From Swiss-Prot:
<dbReference type="InterPro" id="IPR003660">
    <property type="entry name" value="HAMP_dom"/>
</dbReference>
<feature type="topological domain" description="Extracellular">
    <location>
        <begin position="48"/>
        <end position="296"/>
    </location>
</feature>
<keyword id="KW-0145">Chemotaxis</keyword>
<feature type="compositionally biased region" description="Low complexity">
    <location>
        <begin position="387"/>
        <end position="400"/>
    </location>
</feature>
<keyword id="KW-0812">Transmembrane</keyword>
<feature type="transmembrane region" description="Helical">
    <location>
        <begin position="27"/>
        <end position="47"/>
    </location>
</feature>
<keyword id="KW-0807">Transducer</keyword>
<dbReference type="GO" id="GO:0004888">
    <property type="term" value="F:transmembrane signaling receptor activity"/>
</dbReference>
<feature type="topological domain" description="Cytoplasmic">
    <location>
        <begin position="1"/>
        <end position="26"/>
    </location>
</feature>
<feature type="domain" description="Methyl-accepting transducer">
    <location>
        <begin position="484"/>
        <end position="720"/>
    </location>
</feature>
<keyword id="KW-0677">Repeat</keyword>
<feature type="modified residue" description="Glutamate methyl ester (Glu)">
    <location>
        <position position="522"/>
    </location>
</feature>
<feature type="domain" description="HAMP 2">
    <location>
        <begin position="412"/>
        <end position="465"/>
    </location>
</feature>
<comment type="similarity">
    <text>Belongs to the methyl-accepting chemotaxis (MCP) protein family.</text>
</comment>
<protein>
    <recommendedName>
        <fullName>Transducer protein Htr4</fullName>
    </recommendedName>
</protein>
<keyword id="KW-1003">Cell membrane</keyword>
<dbReference type="GO" id="GO:0005886">
    <property type="term" value="C:plasma membrane"/>
</dbReference>
């Protein structure tokens, strides 16, 4: 016993009698079972697949909003650090507006392009000291050109105040205010303005028609994909729960704004440290496009399968059953002897030819009956004539009896053939499509009926075989879909593995960032030690500058004293020169006295001569002459002594003059040398002062660098924390990928279920017995 025969017997026992007796009932029950199975499997698969894919789409949209929020947070932190570092430079120590302006101009070339202007402001005087914007220099707060100045500029705990976004020249900006700590006694700050339009380049839009907006705490749009946001009201209005949200969320299309031209799904994520929220709007048709496409494909497959079954039921099933019922009824009428039954039909297929064969059979039976009746009439006539001719009557009677018996035998054979045909047709109507009428009969009409019926049965058997083949094709397609789902499942698992590797790499990056943070801490400690050494050098430089100033003062005192000595030496030299002049005058006088003495001697000699001439009368005159001579001799001797003394004094005076000249020259040289020394000391003092200023700037720079390195250390710590968050998000993404792989496994399982239902369809169709050569694959 074959498996098919065993299954057929089981089905016959399980099905009610009216179903087993009716081909239409069997066909309807089989189709209904297949429709119910396919519909149930398709509905479950549609609902599960749609729900899982929609949940996955929502998760991806929230991830996209978080990525955009993280990018805005990084941009905001970078601009905050830019403003803080600008305020820590030493250029503000001298409070020189020109130097600060030049510094701002140079620094602006190194800052990001979205930094529009840098201002140096006095919070005490409420005015702009200098700025890269020439129109704001020396301007007071509250200017239309400086909307940020109309806000309360109060730096927060991190030393930087962030203004509310404002519109300036059609561009939405935000100002970062950092307090300058190197101007004691004055409250000054650096104000850096940045355009929020640059943020839009970091927005992540997952679909072609999605758009992203950055909304502040007042419900105004401060940045969007168009880069033209000017604080227009948020599309969902300021009372939306999205405005001011503090956690990542999702808003379905049912709650989206009525102002949009179509339904949108909205994902949002707050920006840490700000009242800003990133909102991602995606059309519902794009957000769930994959889910809709897959659901439509599933429904399309189910629709095609159901439409095919309905088409088969309406075309083949109902028409065939109706024709068989009519044929059965008319065959029963013929069996009852109702030979006037109408067997004309409009069909031209096998069933139509079967009706024609039954009509031919009816006509043949009627002709035979007429022949039998005519033979019976002839027999009666012959029996009447037998009275006239005994010998001929007996022969005729015997012949008539034989003819009658032959006619009755033919009628019995025809009745037997009709009963066999009727039994075979009942078996065929019960579902056994393998039965055939015996065409090898002596009646030509019955042979034609058998041939037509057998042709119709063969076509019906082929039709049922086609139904079985269709079920096989559905099973094969379901198997292929199952294989495709398995391939997609494997792809999902590959994606899950790739995300796992990304998670591992994110963990490695987190470890590297922690190592960098540790190295940065060590570098910060080293720079603080260098800053301490720079402070010691600055103190030494200040002491050297003080000693240089003392040396310069001492040199200046020495120059003053040498100049006084030079003046006194000059005065002494002048006095010696005057003495020398007086000595020259004395020499002149001594020369005159000597001349007078010589003349006096000459007079005395002349007097003695005259006295000698006068003899005794000239004694008195001689005495006088002697006295005069003696006096002249004494005067000459005194003049000689004076001359000798004057010569000695002159020689000493010349020596003194030469010495004074040499002293004056040396004093002059000393004054020049000391002056050069004083100039050198002055230059040295200036250089020491400059060096001290440089050392002080180096010390301040080292302090600033230490602070900057501390900020960098903090930033590296933040990056390390971000790496930790990235690793965590990678793990979450890996879990989501694993969940998606599980979902695909469910889809594969449901596809296998569809294949099983297709097999069930084939089994239902297999309850109709067909020949082995008509089976699929035969």
């Amino acid at each position: 016993m074959s498996i098919r025969s065993f299954a057929h017997r089981i089905l016959r026992r399980a099905l009610p009698g009216f179903v087993r007796r009716s081909y239409l009932a069997k066909f309807g029950v089989a189709l209904l079972a297949v429709v119910v199975c396919i519909s149930a499997a398709g509905g479950v698969m549609y609902l599960n697949t749609s729900e899982h894919l929609q949940q996955s789409s929502r998760t991806e949209l929230k991830k996209a909003a978080e990525l955009s929020s993280s990018a805005v947070d990084n941009w905001h932190d970078e601009r905050t650090n830019n403003a803080r570092m600008l305020a820590q430079y030493g250029v503000f120590d001298n409070d020189n507006a020109t130097e600060v302006q030049q510094f701002f101009t140079d620094e602006q070339h190194h800052l990001p392009s979205d930094v529009r202007d840098i201002h140096y402001v006095s919070l005490t005087d409420a005015r702009v000291i200098t700025s890269t914007d020439a129109g704001l220099r020396n301007a007071s707060f509250g200017s239309e050109a400086a909307p940020w100045s109309r806000q309360q500029l109060t730096p927060g705990d991190d030393g930087v105040f962030v203004s509310q976004p404002y519109v300036n020249d059609g561009i939405t900006e935000v100002a970062y205010v950092a307090r300058v700590s190197s101007t004691p006694g004055r409250r000054t700050a650096v104000v850096m303005t940045a355009s929020l339009a640059a943020i839009s380049s970091s927005f992540w839009d997952p679909t072609p028609h999605s758009f992203t907006q950055l909304v502040d705490g007042t419900g105004s749009v401060i940045a969007d994909d168009s880069k033209r946001a000017t604080r227009q009201p948020y599309v969902e209005n300021a009372t939306s729960p999205i405005v001011g949200a503090r956690a990542v969320g999702f808003q379905p299309a049912a709650q989206a704004a009525k102002e949009m031209d179509q339904a949108h799904e909205t994902a949002y994520a707050p920006v840490d440290g700000t009242p800003w929220v990133v909102t991602l709007h995606v059309p519902t048709s794009e957000a769930y496009g994959l889910a809709s496409n897959m659901a439509e494909n599933v429904l399309l497959i189910l629709g095609i399968a159901l439409a095919g079954l309905v088409f088969i039921a309406l075309t083949l099933g109902r028409g065939t059953v109706r024709a068989l019922n009519d044929l059965e009824a008319k065959a029963a009428a013929l069996e009852r002897g109702e030979y006037d039954t109408d067997l004309d039909v409009a069909r031209v297929d096998e069933l139509g030819r079967l009706f024609e064969a039954f009509a031919s059979l009816r006509d043949t039976v009627q002709a035979r009956i007429r022949d039998a009746n005519e033979q019976q009439v002839d027999a009666e006539a012959a029996r009447s004539e037998a009275e006239a001719a005994q010998a001929d009557a007996e022969a005729a009677q015997a012949e008539a009896e034989a003819a009658r018996e032959e006619s009755e035998a033919q009628a019995r054979r025809l009745e037997t053939t009709a009963e066999a045909f009727s039994e075979t047709m009942r078996a065929y109507a019960a579902g056994d499509l393998t039965v055939r009428l015996d065409a090898d009969v002596e009646q030509a009409a019955m042979a034609d009926i058998a041939a037509a019926f057998n042709e119709m049965a063969a076509d019906m058997e082929a039709t049922i075989a086609d139904v079985v083949a269709f079920a096989d094709e559905v099973a094969t397609a379901s198997t292929d879909a199952s294989d495709s789902a398995a391939a997609v499942e494997q792809t999902g698992r590959d994606v899950s593995d790739a995300v796992g590797r990304i998670r591992d790499r994110a963990a490695d990056q987190r470890d590297q960032l922690e190592a960098v943070a540790s190295e940065t801490d060590e570098m910060s400690a080293t720079i603080e030690e260098v800053a301490a050494s720079a402070d010691q050098v600055a103190e030494t430089s200040q002491r050297a500058a003080a000693l240089g100033d003392d040396g310069q003062a001492a040199a200046q005192d020495a120059v003053a004293q040498l100049e006084e000595i030079e003046d006194e030496t000059q005065a002494a030299a002048t006095a010696v020169d005057d003495l020398e002049a007086k000595m020259s005058e004395i020499e002149t006088i001594v020369a005159a006295i000597t001349d007078i003495a010589e003349q006096t001697n000459m007079l005395a000699l002349n007097a003695n001569i005259e006295a000698a001439r006068a003899d005794q009368d000239g004694d008195g005159f001689a005495v006088v002459a002697d006295e005069v001579k003696d006096l002249a001799d004494e005067s000459k001797a005194s003049a000689a002594e004076i001359e000798a003394l004057v010569a000695e004094v002159r020689a000493q005076t010349e020596t003194s003059v030469a010495a004074m000249d040499r002293i004056q020259e040396r004093v002059s040289d000393g004054v020049e040398t000391v002056s050069e020394t004083e100039r050198s000391l002055s230059e040295i003092a200036g250089r020491i002062a400059e060096a001290d200023t440089g050392v002080q700037e180096i010390s301040n720079a080292m302090d600033d660098q230490a602070a900057s390195v501390s900020d960098v250390t903090t930033a590296v710590g933040d990056v390390a924390a971000l790496g930790e968050e990235t690793a965590t998000e990678a793990e979450s993404t890996a879990d989501a990928a694993a969940e998606q792989a599980t979902t695909l496994s469910d889809v594969a399982a449901q596809t296998e279920t569809l294949a099983e239902h297709a097999v069930a369809l084939r089994e239902h169709a297999a309850q109709f017995e067909v020949a082995a050569d008509n089976e699929p694959g035969a």
